């Protein structure tokens, strides 16, 4: 099975504090790998290393078999590695169409123009409608982001990442701040969109263990900067002590 994204013996220190310690993980083609752990476990540092926002103190990160050393997040996105952030990264005054257009233009390396003109470009408009349709936002194209529900804002944020045509996408808490009733709907939409768009691998950072159990192929658990476990869901949730370490309490699954 082809490994798309991996870390090899990666460590990251901030001064005397070691946030990650000798972490080696891989995301293979066709996998959704969830990264879990208590606050301060190193999840955010790991995602920032995977996307080129941080450089490791030791070890290396590889994307499609090549080291990303010296490659920034924008160039990585051009090569097919996209990220949707935990905190919604959209401008409230822009419409849904304008938000997706900005992502499409950055991917196609077209010269920036007024967003209103971009949405009038037939090729760009077709791509906007395609992406919006996948995420159930086509009826909201002319709506400013500020007027969207929290769930719709999450979908728009992820839709913008999908507009980059990624091979691998990192989803950082994609359902945070969303009602429990909407969480599974959002996850199902994301996975269906990934399959439709030809996304080859997904990294999911998630606190909700119900979602992790339902959608993961593998679960990587971090604790104090180390890999505590790298297991399929069945084996992970069969270990009450492991679950207690990750979420701070025992729970039956």
Predicted segment positions?
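Glycine-rich phosphate-binding loops of nucleotide-dependent enzymes
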Residues: 2-253
